[in-house]
Amino acid sequence: MLEFLRGRDVLVAGWGISGRSLVEPLRDIGAHPVVTDSGAKALAEAAELGLEVATSVELESADLSRFALVITSPGWRPDSPVLVSAVTEGIPVWGDVEFAWWVDQARIYGPVRKWLVVTGTNGKTTTTQMTHAILRAAGIASVACGNIGLPILDALRRNPGPQVLAVELSSFQLHWAPSVRPEAGVVLNVAEDHLDWHGGLDAYAAAKARALVGRIGVVGLDDPVAAALARRSKARRTVGFRVGVPADGELGVVDGKLLDRAFTKAAILAEVGDISPPGPAGVADALAAAALTRAIDVAPQFVKEGLQEHKVGPHRAAFVREVAGVEFIDDSKATNPHAARSSILAHPHVVWIAGGRLKGAAVEDLVEEVADRLVAAVLIGVDAPVIAAALARHAPEVPVVEVRAGDDAVMADDPLRPDEADAVMAAAVRTAAGYARAGDTVLLAPAAASLDMFADYTHRGRSFADAVHALEDGDIGRQP
């Protein structure tokens, strides 16, 4: 499949983590990588490595016929001028995941691996980590890769190489990877997110459904959109999971135990109390990871051991500190309303810190559903007014405070300087602490992306934690 690239030029569109991972594999198959990016710094870095570079502006009006293939960063939209030009000229456009799939199928770096693919609006990283933990417990050489941080190509090039890949894939990556056929793939849930990129919920869901095309497809039955995808699944067999009593062919929960009725008559897999993070969302992720690993015949005892060993990563419903009886929880990874909903519903009394860039997602349903849990809301970021308006409609009795940088700087298109963003977060945390009383939870669950203010969600979470650690007992309950 890759022979057509030998001796040919391949355009690498985007010099990020995925773009960098492409260079050596392209050279290993005899292709000549050419890098394009909209950033001068990125192109300078590529040029310093001896790579041929071209600006995206230059290529928009150039003849692209010299290229046998364009491999795009997952963040590049299909309507990007360079990609549109390539398609118009009949040049195939792949994502780095698509290329990695064919590199694996061609055995460039050893025997073909089993791919266990995880996608969904929320819970992808936790499920991928759980899957990897179970595989490790079973003694299976494996690696967690993809959207979780390690490019798949880098995972394939490891020596000794893994037998199984636990692959987290975003909707962007799946859009550009039509050939991937995983051994098993799961769609955890589907809620409004990245609609500005995909153009609508139907297209977004269709991208997620590309995980359901291999030997085993797995869907989250508690999510109506994901459950509906089961009917469209192209997998040879499709099973479901629910945080409730499972029917035949499902995984679920009975009397506090995770139960498999899909791959055997009935097997206990783990105790709900062993799951990290606790709560329905964590249990759902554990069921998904169990389904993926049971699909490749991992024994129940190793599912149990892996889930017991797994601990939630940073910024995912992570406990930061208790101050004067008030818990402070960092769920900065809750970057959309669906994730924020699960986070808020895990606590009875919440002072909610939210806001950022909503990316076209609606918050009306979220606010209406969690209104009775809210003690107060402290809002930051460019779309704070949108959340404030929803709170005014559906939770008018809840105190709402918008915290902004000076002169509305938070509303600017460019991110704030790190010190400015940290100052806004510190003010938000102090304000939230003032509304909290013993027994309450101050919860950072933004329901929005971070890039209007912060470098990424990890920066936002660190900023929150730093502000929490600066609090004193006297900061609690200062508001009337």
Curated annotation (Swiss-Prot):
Its EC number is 6.3.2.9. ATP binds at G120, T121, N122, G123, K124, T125, T126. One of its GO terms (cellular component) is cytoplasm. The keyword Nucleotide-binding applies. GO terms for molecular function: ATP binding; UDP-N-acetylmuramoylalanine-D-glutamate ligase activity. Transmembrane segments: none annotated. Pathway: Cell wall biogenesis; peptidoglycan biosynthesis. Pfam families: Mur_ligase_C (PF02875), Mur_ligase_M (PF08245), MurD-like_N (PF21799). InterPro entries: Mur-like_cat_sf, Mur_ligase_C, Mur_ligase_C_dom_sf, Mur_ligase_cen, MurD. GO terms for biological process: cell division; cell wall organization; peptidoglycan biosynthetic process; regulation of cell shape. It catalyses: UDP-N-acetyl-alpha-D-muramoyl-L-alanine + D-glutamate + ATP = UDP-N-acetyl-alpha-D-muramoyl-L-alanyl-D-glutamate + ADP + phosphate + H(+). Keywords: ATP-binding, Cell cycle, Cell division, Cell shape, Cell wall biogenesis/degradation, Cytoplasm, Ligase, Nucleotide-binding, Peptidoglycan synthesis. It is found in: Cytoplasm. Belongs to the MurCDEF family. Cell wall formation. Catalyzes the addition of glutamate to the nucleotide precursor UDP-N-acetylmuramoyl-L-alanine (UMA). PANTHER family: UDP-N-ACETYLMURAMOYLALANINE--D-GLUTAMATE LIGASE (PTHR43692:SF1). This is UDP-N-acetylmuramoylalanine--D-glutamate ligase. It comes from Nocardia farcinica (strain IFM 10152).
